[in-house]
Structures are given as C-alpha cells and as structure tokens.
C-alpha cells in the first residue's frame, strides 16, 4: 500500500435513512486498490464486513481525517441487528467542515451528489478549491455513456 495516500469514507448526518449501496460499492472497490482506506462513522453504522474488507474502521472522525489525502462523505442507515435501516445519530459534529479538513493533508473533498449543504458538508468545504465534486460528477456521466454504448453494441 502507498504511504500517505489515504482515502476516508465518512458517514455524514442525514435526516432520512439511506441505503448502503454507494458506501458498500465504494468500499469494495477501494479495497481493490493500493490506497490506505479508512472508514469513519459513529458506532452503530458499521457496514457489512464483506464490503469493509481490509479497511480500517475509526470511530473518532478527527483521528481518521489526520493526514488524509481524500475525503469522500456519504450517509447511510444502520445495518446491523434491530437497528437495521434506522438513523441512530444526527450529530452535526459529523458534518464535514473546515474543522475536520484542517487536519488532513490538504485533502480533496468528494461526494457523489446531490448533497445536502450544511448537513453533509459545509458551504466552505464544497465551494473550496479542494472540492472535486463537479469533476467527479462529470466522470459518472462518461462512465454511464461507456456502459450504455457497450450494452447497445452487444445487442
């Protein structure tokens, strides 16, 4: 694994319980790379072990962000036991803000969009030069076009 190339998957607050599809697929793909991968979230929001893989799970968000090169914020509902599909915490301390970004390695901020501003991430972070959410969205368009082209070619 590369040194200092760290990607953090951060569970941010959200008013509704959202599925774990994006966090699970992101974790699965990150585990196939040579990046150090850390998942941070409040206790009770664990992802399925088969997707967490070799990722480090850190419940202290500030500790997880230390020295990170990329921050990818996303929200998801609880997975395990009687709490399945529930929102266990709406703690705004988990909103990605300058406070957390200051301890990173000048990390790039990512989110799959659309995003609830000032709930998932503050305006200061998403509007900063370190935010790459628009190029990220543009890449999704290209990826979808390529997949559609391949599907149509196979008909």
Name each region found by the language model.
Residues 1-8:
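Short, small-residue-biased leader/transition segments that mark boundaries at the very start
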Residues 4, 34, 67-68, 106, ...:
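Short, well-ordered alpha-helix to beta-strand connector turns
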Residues 9-73:
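Glycine-rich phosphate/diphosphate-binding loop of Rossmann-like nucleotide-binding domains
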Residues 14, 85-89, 135:
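Conserved short-loop catalytic and cofactor-binding motifs
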Residues 27-31, 102, 144-149:
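Predominant activation on well-ordered alpha-helical scaffold segments within soluble catalytic domains
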Residues 50-124:
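Rossmann-like adenosine-cofactor binding region
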Residues 106-108, 112-155:
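Adenosine-phosphate binding glycine-rich loop
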């Amino acid at each position: 694994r590369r040194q200092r190339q760290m990607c953090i998957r951060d569970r941010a607050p959200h008013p509704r319980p959202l599925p774990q599809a994006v966090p699970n697929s992101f974790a699965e793909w990150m585990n196939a790379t040579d990046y150090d991968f850390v998942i941070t979230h409040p206790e009770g929001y664990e992802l399925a072990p088969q997707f967490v893989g070799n990722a480090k799970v850190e419940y202290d968000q500030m500790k997880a962000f230390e020295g990170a090169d990329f921050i990818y914020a996303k929200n998801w509902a609880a997975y395990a036991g009687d709490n399945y599909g529930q929102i266990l915490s709406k703690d705004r301390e988990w909103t990605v803000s300058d406070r957390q970004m200051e301890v990173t390695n000048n990390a790039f901020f990512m989110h799959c969009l659309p995003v609830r501003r000032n709930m998932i991430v503050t305006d200061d972070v998403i509007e900063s030069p370190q935010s790459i959410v628009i190029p990220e969205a543009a890449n999704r368009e290209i990826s979808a076009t390529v997949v559609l082209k391949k599907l149509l070619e196979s008909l």
